[in-house]
Amino acid sequence: MSQSVSERTRIKSDRYESGVIPYAKMGYWDASYAVKTTDVLALFRITPQPGVDPVEAAAAVAGESSTATWTVVWTDLLTACDRYRAKAYRVDPVPNAADQYFAFIAYECDLFEEGSLANLTASIIGNVFGFKAVAALRLEDMRIPHSYLKTFQGPATGIVVERERLNKYGTPLLGATVKPKLGLSGKNYGRVVYEGLKGGLDFLKDDENINSQPFMRWRERFLNCMEGINRASAATGEVKGSYLNVTAATMEEVYKRSEYAKEVGSIIIMIDLVMGYTAIQSMALWARENDMLLHLHRAGNSTYARQKNHGINFRVICKWMRMSGVDHIHAGTVVGKLEGDPLMIKGFYHTLRLTTLDVNLPYGLFFEMSWASLRRCMPVASGGIHCGQMHQLIHYLGDDVVLQFGGGTIGHPDGIQAGATANRVALESMVLARNEGADYFNQEVGPQILRNAAKTCGPLQSALDLWKDISFNYTSTDTADFAATSTANV
């Protein structure tokens, strides 16, 4: 039965005379809420302060990340406040964690500016992470609706077009980071690029913190890198590249360096995650307009992505970066020196490479989501990997990935070119064995494939001898909540 005008007036009067009332009673909790296809959905892992009800904590997160403040305000009456309030609609206990809960929250899509990652994140992670009602808070996953995704450009090039440009199919791409990452002169830097590409790699790259320092200014680096690229391409007949890091103090300088990279013939440029979301989107637009690949180094991500109870899960960063429009992003190796539970890494790679995401709790994927024709993003595996792990890398990561062996190329005892050749032969022999039906991931079969290939490749034999006992066996900090897993270093 509908309420009379006087009854509705009394209810509103009671609400707005009450000063401070619980968030759950302010409209930010609705267990019967019917999720709309146009809603932005967020899953938070919440750790309420002692004595705070989980439902109230979830409602507080919904309120503080949408329209609420600490008290009732009359100006709510001047808005469609019932529509614009985020709705916490489900709270589940986290398995094997007595004080943690998964809170599902729905946001009206009109709360966010079209095509603006900065505006989306200003609400979702902007202020709420410092809220006293929760002891810790982590953004675990998001579902971005089709209608909102369509306002973002997605990767400027994508996996398919990148392979067409390189004319390379059915195999991972090979790369390496120049080492040492700081201190080389431009001439020696270019020599490293040439040796690595001549030996069989597809890409060399700058590291995250090489920009324009006194020992080597950016223009000097770009020129020497391009000399190495052009010589290696002419010698091998293959398309080659080196990720030229254009990260700088101002966007004016970033654009200046990017334009110069284009003028001297580079096919790819690189930026760092620490540039910020607006800068990343701006560079993705520039890369699309100028027909360049855009590589993103995830510098800084572990400051908020690694801890299990507070921060942002990296799968969310993967979604945001694919929306922003980068072509490459570092996404973990499983077997290297950096954080990488195998199931979590699978979830990151699915997020970057699939056109539709299904719910997969062991992989940390909580929502179905169509990518609305946004191009796929190429994951990059980098950090403590070597050719002796090739069977594991292909098994865990598949073909659509750039395998970057920095120390695993430049640390080769016979030199950089030999290190690159060892990686190329290891990769091609493993891909061939896989395509012929070999049980290559078997811990006896895979290494034997490499040993057989090394009989006719001295650089591979030297690499296997040097690194055969190297692994990084540490338990991952961020593991799946719905499956018992451990770091897969074997």
From Swiss-Prot:
Coiled coil: none annotated. It catalyses: 2 (2R)-3-phosphoglycerate + 2 H(+) = D-ribulose 1,5-bisphosphate + CO2 + H2O; D-ribulose 1,5-bisphosphate + O2 = 2-phosphoglycolate + (2R)-3-phosphoglycerate + 2 H(+). The modification N6-carboxylysine is found at residue 205. It comes from the Eukaryota. The record marks 337 as: Transition state stabilizer. Belongs to the RuBisCO large chain family. Type I subfamily. Heterohexadecamer of 8 large chains and 8 small chains. This is Ribulose bisphosphate carboxylase large chain.
